């Protein structure tokens, strides 16, 4: 975050990582969980795959499905301590080492 973000309370920071494939994403998600680092998949694996939208007609959504399978929301919030950022970074490095495709 920059000083621009720090001075604006209406800005909501977020960080989304996009990985090469779903298998890598799943590995990274698990390794981060093992380190106690939470991740988010804000839109599940595509809204059209959610039970609430199961009956809503839609056409093919290959880009949505591809991106939904490969992204993770990483922790980033106002007040994130330097210690927490370093812990997240260390967890990502461990995940990188474990995920061959990354």
Which residues fall in each region the model found?
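PLP-dependent aminotransferase class I/II
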Residues: 1-102
């Amino acid at each position: 975050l920059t000083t621009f973000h720090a001075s604006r309370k209406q800005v909501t920071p977020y960080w989304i990582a996009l990985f090469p494939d779903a298998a890598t994403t799943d590995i990274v998600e698990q390794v981060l969980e093992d380190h106690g680092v939470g991740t988010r998949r804000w839109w599940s694996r595509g809204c059209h795959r959610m039970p609430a939208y199961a009956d809503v007609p839609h056409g093919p959504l290959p880009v949505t499905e591809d991106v939904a399978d490969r992204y993770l929301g990483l922790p980033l919030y106002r007040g994130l301590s330097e210690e927490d950022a370093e812990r997240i970074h260390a967890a990502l490095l461990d995940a990188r080492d474990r995920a061959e495709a990354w």
